[in-house]
A protein has these predicted regions:
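Sec-dependent N-terminal signal peptides
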Residues: 4-13
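Cell-envelope and extracellular/periplasmic
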Residues: 71-74, 101-102, 106, 110
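Charged helix-capping and loop-helix junction motifs
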Residues: 114-123, 156-163
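Helix C-cap/helix->beta junction micro-motif
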Residues: 131-133, 172-173
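Catalytic His-Asp segment of secreted/periplasmic serine-dependent ester chemistry enzymes
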Residues: 142-236
Length: 236
């Protein structure tokens, strides 16, 4: 009788898996079609989470006029980005990858994780890029003093700690480091309402500050002084 019960449970589990189908945990499928039909050389790819994912929607001209590719996916942690790094970065053969990652690890989107492991995942992305001849621009996390989806957390100090690790690593490896945190910080580890409505994700004015900084980082990586398009708000 016991064997019959166990067998029934096993068959039920298999049936449930088949019914649900496979889960695209790393979301390989998000950019699969866009990657497949890409028919031009790629200069710069932006890898990231919701901050990168939303950037192209908030200011599409910055990406379209510069020919930049946005490969951000909302909610993703560093291990998910690392999993799809080959398909969404390496296989596209860009000259430069801009990496902005880590805030969703601090938010525990996939459960608790030590900052050292978050840092290690980001370093692994840098290693993979450089091994494949892709130059890296490494970005600090943006200031963030609260999560709208996890209001009980106070992330500002962890953000600073991870940024310290990233900045030190970038200096040691001679990788261009873009300090968004310094440019957007309201003095308390967050962002002002002018730059962010939820304390974590920038609005257009925040992205405009980021654009002027990141193009400098891209030029440092390429060893050029190229003039990139950046959006300018009309004078009031």
């Amino acid at each position: 009788m016991k064997k019959i019960v166990l067998l029934s449970l096993a068959l039920f589990s298999v049936a449930a898996l088949r019914a649900d189908g496979p889960v695209d945990w790393a979301q390989y499928g998000r950019y699969e079609l866009q990657n497949a039909v890409l028919d031009r050389p790629v200069e710069v790819v932006f890898m990231g989470n919701s901050i990168t994912d939303s950037w192209i929607r908030v200011d599409p001209d910055f990406f379209e006029r510069n020919g930049f590719l946005d490969r951000g996916i909302s909610g993703q942690t560093t291990v998910q980005m690392l999993a799809r790094f080959r398909s969404d970065v390496i296989d596209l053969k860009p000259q430069v990858v801009v990496i902005l990652a880590g805030i969703n690890d601090i938010a525990r989107n996939n459960g608790p994780i030590e900052l050292e492991n978050v840092f290690g995942n980001i370093v692994s992305m840098c290693d993979l890029a450089r091994y494949n001849g892709i130059k890296v621009v490494l970005c600090s996390l943006l200031p963030c003093d609260r999560f709208s989806w996890r209001p009980e957390m106070e992330p500002a100090d962890e953000v600073r700690r991870l940024n310290t690790m990233l900045e030190r690593y970038a200096a040691e490896q001679k990788i261009p480091y873009v300090d968004y945190h310094r440019a957007l910080d309201n003095g308390s580890g967050g962002m002002s309402e002018e730059l962010s409505q939820d304390g974590c994700h920038p609005v257009l004015s925040g992205y405009l500050r980021m654009e002027s900084l990141v193009v400098e980082g891209i030029n440092r990586a390429l060893g050029v002084q190229k003039t990139w398009y950046t959006t300018v708000l009309p004078a009031k």
